[in-house]
């Protein structure tokens, strides 16, 4: 679960990390109060979960109320579905530093990551100039020690008062990481002001989905989703993604769904949805189709391969979904696996042709969407 920047910074402040003064606004009518509290110049930061906000023009520095309101209006009306802005004081910056904490899955340890250059895309820097990145691994049972922090800051070339300040930030970031069951806690950039103070300029916090139940402060809300249907799917525990294509894809299992998604694109088609009803969701065909039908499409492609999830149960669920929602689009099916012969009979009785070759099913769906079948 990825948190918004304002939420990450709230978590940082709870653990003693310094952040710029900021006020969250959800509409134009809240701007005057925010400007009165924060002052000018200030920064308008769009609260969206996608990365690259600066490059996308979603973070703007403003110097007065008139320009700030015009800029805020543009951001709220942008194609990026901005529903919240963080109005934050502008910081007099001398330099920027990168800090993050994540998990090393190979060594099963917590990994501290630092770079003396902040505001960077760390993945690109790792590929082009890896020597600039310093990593220190921490045994979770042992916990963070002073030598871990010193190894990181010294490795970044930081010493004296600056090294101590950055070290204190590392300790606070580690506390945040552990307290929130995080997969990633990141400050990029960490501002070093001209008077020598360290301030978290940006914040990213991703909570492990398996531990969200331990974090009641962050319930699943509409704010985290671009569309109402994605929110509904998340509430049901059904993985759902929406695209601009015309082939509604219903599959069982993440691996199969991803494979079929790629096959559709390879065949010249364009998915409208990516929906999984495998695993624990394999009896949710009725609800899955209901979600699919909320996105316009020309054809519905159903591909499953059941092992523990029985093919006949999925086929029966699909037939019930068709009876319940009576979709107008043609339906292409390829349901294989445990009890597949029974599944084929169920589909034939419902007037559906059970295909047994995934590539054939994909091609037929693509042809239907293109008007060739």
From Swiss-Prot:
Q: How, per the record, is the cofactor bound?
A: Binds 1 Mg(2+) ion per subunit.
Q: Does the keyword Iron-sulfur apply?
A: no
* Record Pfam families: ATP-grasp_2, Ligase_CoA
Q: Which InterPro entries match?
A: ATP-grasp (IPR011761), ATP-grasp_succ-CoA_synth-type (IPR013650), ATP_grasp_subdomain_1 (IPR013815), Succ-CoA_synthase_bsu_CS (IPR017866), SUCC_ACL_C (IPR005811), Succ_CoA_ligase-like_bsu (IPR005809), Succinyl-CoA_synth-like (IPR016102)
Name the SUPFAM superfamilies for this protein.
Glutathione synthetase ATP-binding domain-like, Succinyl-CoA synthetase domains
Q: Which domain of life is it from?
A: Bacteria
Where's the ATP-grasp domain? 9-249
Give the catalytic activity.
sulfoacetate + ATP + CoA = sulfoacetyl-CoA + ADP + phosphate
Which PROSITE patterns does UniProt cross-reference here?
A: ATP_GRASP (PS50975), SUCCINYL_COA_LIG_3 (PS01217)
Needed co-factor(s)? Mg(2+)
A Gene Ontology term for the protein's cellular component: succinate-CoA ligase complex
| Functional pH dependence | Optimum pH is 7.5.
GO molecular function terms attached to this record: ATP binding; metal ion binding; succinate-CoA ligase (ADP-forming) activity
Assembly and partners? Answer: Forms a complex with SauD.
Put simply, this protein is called ADP-forming sulfoacetate-CoA ligase subunit SauC
User: Which organism does this sequence originate in?
Assistant: Bilophila wadsworthia (strain 3_1_6)
């Amino acid at each position: 679960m990825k948190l918004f920047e304002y939420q990450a910074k709230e978590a940082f402040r709870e653990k003693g990390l310094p952040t710029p003064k900021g006020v969250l606004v959800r509409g134009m009518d809240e701007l005057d109060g925010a400007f009165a509290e924060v002052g000018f110049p200030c920064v308008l930061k769009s609260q969206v979960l996608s990365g690259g906000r600066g490059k996308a023009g979603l973070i703007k520095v403003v110097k007065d109320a008139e320009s700030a309101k015009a800029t805020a209006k543009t951001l709220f009306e942008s194609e990026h579905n901005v529903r919240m802005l963080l109005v934050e004081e502008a910081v007099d910056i001398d330099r920027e530093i990168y800090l993050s904490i994540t998990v090393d899955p190979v060594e099963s340890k917590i990994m501290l990551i630092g770079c003396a250059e902040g505001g960077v895309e760390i993945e690109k820097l790792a590929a082009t100039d890896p020597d600039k990145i310093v990593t220190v691994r921490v045994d979770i049972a042992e916990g963070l020690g002073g030598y871990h922090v010193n190894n990181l800051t010294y490795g970044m070339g930081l010493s004296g008062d600056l090294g101590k300040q950055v070290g204190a930030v590392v300790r606070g970031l580690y506390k945040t990481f552990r307290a929130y069951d995080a997969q990633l806690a990141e400050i990029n950039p960490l501002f070093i002001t001209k008077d020598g103070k360290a301030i978290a300029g940006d914040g990213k916090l991703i909570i492990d989905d398996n531990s969200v139940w331990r974090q009641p402060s962050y319930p699943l809300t509409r704010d985290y989703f671009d569309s109402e249907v994605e929110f509904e799917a998340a509430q049901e525990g059904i993985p759902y993604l929406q695209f601009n294509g015309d082939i509604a894809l219903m599959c069982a299992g993440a691996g199969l769904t991803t494979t079929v998604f790629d096959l559709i694109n390879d065949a010249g088609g364009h998915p409208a949805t990516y929906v999984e009803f495998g695993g624990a969701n394999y009896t949710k065909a009725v609800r899955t189709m209901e979600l699919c039908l909320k996105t316009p499409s020309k054809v519905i492609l159903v591909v499953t391969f059941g092992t523990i999830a029985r093919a006949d149960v999925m086929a029966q669920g699909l037939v019930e979904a068709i009876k319940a929602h009576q979709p107008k689009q043609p339906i292409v099916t390829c349901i294989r696996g445990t009890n597949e012969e029974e599944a084929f009979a169920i589909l034939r009785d419902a007037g559906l042709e059970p295909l047994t070759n995934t590539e054939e099913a994909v091609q037929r769906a693509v042809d239907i969407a293109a008007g060739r079948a």
